[in-house]
């Protein structure tokens, strides 16, 4: 393992087009903060960089819908989200904005450098243009009918009904969202980044991390590499964004694509952090220093941007340089998703718990603990109000909080608020089990945050059990020295727990620190080169040390009445969702206009057998099927990849519309359509005829 001396942690930039919700917190920001706080406890040199992604089409759409400027939109949500993160204890060293002057300059420097090296490719292409609005239309400004499922409200980038990723040119009857007019095709030129040029380098880079990156990260990355990396546009025809830094007619009205500019925010924000410290060159110690470890904390939907695209951009910059070369990420700990009460978080349906609103009602530390214990490391997890209540009451209040308060209160009452006994480190280890602390450290080091926090709570349970079983309130009457030994151990366990739990419930641990009679906070003791973590293994409170003299209830229990309004909200949201689903189902049940018997006879339905099946590149929902229809073969592109693997389809009997006119989809020809039925949950089930010697036979 590389002996790194510094660590730079970045977190995915939340889009400044809405408030962050608990799903965002669980997948990205809390795990990053747990790791950063743990590393600070160890005395490591680490910085945590984040910020707002403030460019892109959704922001302009929101601004136009509300009749305000894009700047007004991003100002609102940057402030809202940064305040929510701060209130939740997410300890950024710097939280920037991609609308800043430094960021614009940084992104333009990268563009200029790569352009001057001749790496970019210029391509002319035809895009939709709205004559009424006098502007080119990006994919999200175009709507129309999906060619796969015939949804009449598909967007230009994706059909929400069937999930197929689309381009605006694939839509049937496209219309502009700006004017409702039918757009026309016009030629425009854009700059493209040739990802394929760096495929070999990227494959070598990824191969170096086969043993230490998470499987989901490797799976997403390998899928893209196997398909072959393609050129990717890095400019758009928009007014909101970072201007292409060229004085030419071609660059007029063009900005950098947000995927290119946003990932460079990590660099520009680190620059701003250094400038804020008055050490403008210090950022290079973290970006251009091989001794610094770079970690990107993200959700699984962001993987390839951090394992392929950003590394490729940095490779392009490094090309031909002997100095000022950028580090590539050493690890990309991407999380799975956290759902909410059994359903996916959805801003569009308002099915979410927003972080700022949550913290107006409940303490941050209770949320941090609950989410850490449900951290979606290897699979999707679920946040529920009942689980939140149970963990707060049963684990934080009844276990950790109860032990701390009992220990402090008994010492204040029976030993005049002083630690009553000196003892050896071995005595503490017999109770605390330092091996457990080492196991917790290994869990944090390996990004296994749920394991780390769960093991910390196990120590709290053992401590609580130790106090209860030894009954110092009885011993004090018969053997005061024995009671003194028990309380000295208990108080030192309180001290150890204040350190072990600091990454997850920092505000509470600072309060425990004060109750134990220490000046300042744990935060104030943190400094590079000093390991507070190791101090958790040693007696921190010697005989005669005075406690604060008073205690407090660390966690207020959550009553049923406290979460009743939240459960009611869920009922209403679920009812609305079910109503929409029922309405959609009812709409589907409406029969189509009558046709004549002769028209029906024109449809040639036949039994076919699937010979081969494969996924379609850049179309996550499509399978390409080769079908044997009697003595003939046909190729069909079917939108079933979400529900069937290629291997599952091979050998199946299916029903094909054999005389359907050919249709071009994704530059490939589909010579028919297979029949499937949609279940109540939206899942598609392919119709499979049974019987022998029926291949090629007509359905009657």
Swiss-Prot record:
InterPro entries: aa-tRNA-synth_I_CS, Anticodon_Met, Met-tRNA-synth_bsu_C, Met-tRNA_ligase_1, Met-tRNA_synth, Methionyl/Leucyl_tRNA_Synth, MetRS_core, MetRS_Zn
Binding site for ATP: 347
Location of the motif 'HIGH' region: 14-24
PROSITE patterns registered for this protein in UniProt: AA_TRNA_LIGASE_I, TRBD
CDD domains with a match to the protein in the record: Anticodon_Ia_Met, MetRS_core
Swiss-Prot/TrEMBL cofactor(s): Zn(2+)
Pfam families on file: Anticodon_3, tRNA-synt_1g, tRNA_bind
A single MF term (Gene Ontology): ATP binding
Binding site for Zn(2+): 146, 149, 159, 162
Domain tRNA-binding per the UniProt entry, residue ranges: 599-700
Cell compartment(s), UniProt: Cytoplasm
Cofactor note: Binds 1 zinc ion per subunit.
Keyword list, A-Z: Aminoacyl-tRNA synthetase, ATP-binding, Cytoplasm, Ligase, Metal-binding, Nucleotide-binding, Protein biosynthesis, RNA-binding, tRNA-binding, Zinc
Catalytic function, reaction form: tRNA(Met) + L-methionine + ATP = L-methionyl-tRNA(Met) + AMP + diphosphate
EC number from the UniProt entry: 6.1.1.10
Coiled-coil regions listed: none
Positions of short motif 'KMSKS' region: 344-348
Gene Ontology cellular-component annotations: cytosol
Single biological process term from Gene Ontology: methionyl-tRNA aminoacylation
Function statement: Is required not only for elongation of protein synthesis but also for the initiation of all mRNA translation through initiator tRNA(fMet) aminoacylation.
Quaternary structure and partners: Homodimer.
Family designation: Belongs to the class-I aminoacyl-tRNA synthetase family. MetG type 1 subfamily.
NCBIfam families: metG, metG_C_term, PRK00133.1
PANTHER family assigned: METHIONINE--TRNA LIGASE (PTHR45765), METHIONINE--TRNA LIGASE, CYTOPLASMIC (PTHR45765:SF1)
Protein's UniProt name: Methionine--tRNA ligase
Organism: Pelodictyon phaeoclathratiforme (strain DSM 5477 / BU-1)
Annotated gene: metG
